[in-house]
Amino acid sequence: MRRRLLLLAALLLANLAIAAVGMLRADDVGTGKAFTAKVGLVFDLGGRGDKSFNDSAYRGLERALRELPIHGEYLEPGDGADRESAIRLLAARGFDLVIGVGIMFTDDVLLVARDYPDVLFACVDMIVLPDQKLPPNVIALKFREEEGSYLVGAAAGLATQSKTVGFIGGMDMPLIRKFEAGYRAGVKAVCPECKILSAYAGVTPEAFKDPVKGKELALAQFGRGADVLYHASGSTGLGAFEAARLAPPGTRRLVIGVDSDQTHEAPGHVLSSMVKRVDVAVFDTLKAVSEQPHRRDIAGVRVFGLAQDGVDYVADARNANLIDAKMRERIEALRRDIVAGRIQVPSQVAPAEVAP
């Protein structure tokens, strides 16, 4: 009885917390078919409109709403403390699948999944320890970010004229170090003599939503001679694009976007973007659940790399003047080698590689 009262109290708090910031949204599907599943998406810091990670997840939900017979809703918690409340709210309302978008949902998903064994939960970028056994109703959606970062690193190494490139991370944590590790390896694969600068915006989740800090770090690296920067920092990276747009006439400043195609952020200054296909992972998971809401065979760890179309880089007509046919041919050869297993991309940065 006491446990039920505690869960009821938590649910009431969830309603109050989310209603207080007015962040509840719902989208019904106009497929003409009866709903086969109810699915919910809970965003992390930055929410919709971050032009990066969360927006990519939302594109996956949007596609599912267009193509699948599902009912879908999304929530934008007011702050990090509301993560558990938000996923608990959807679970208590009888949703078949609840997805937490971001690594910070790891503990919350594991906690709530125990209380709702009949609900499937998924977590994007979930932390899974080597010997950890996940609950049978939990899906960990993980990516080989280092593989996509390797390709944009190669693009940076081929495009740089100063032989100095930079990396800007959001929160200094193992996940973002994967981006840096792949980027460094890609740069060095095509430009062994290149110097790589590195900086992080902070050590807390707020480091992913500080464009002012991002601009400051970008200007510092441009000032030290870098002419190409890669950011893996959420909306903090918007400051890097601003720094590139402020380039004096005749000065070369290029930025590589992350998670989503960010070409539009600074046309003419965006070399490419490392596209982390959170939308693919979300859509594939929603599709599986729509076909059989109570299935459990999709639980466990699901990994998306180059071979699974989980990561990629942008190369099209908009940046053809920056990534020409010869450069693209070299990058595509590297892609084939990674998919075939001939190149093993590192996921950790060696201490000796870290530039001051």
Located regions from the model:
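Short, Lys/Arg-rich N-terminal segment immediately upstream of the first membrane anchor
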Residues: 1-2
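A residue-level marker of the well-folded mature domains of exported/periplasmic proteins
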Residues: 5-8, 20-356
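Core hydrophobic alpha-helical transmembrane segments of single-pass membrane proteins
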Residues: 10-18
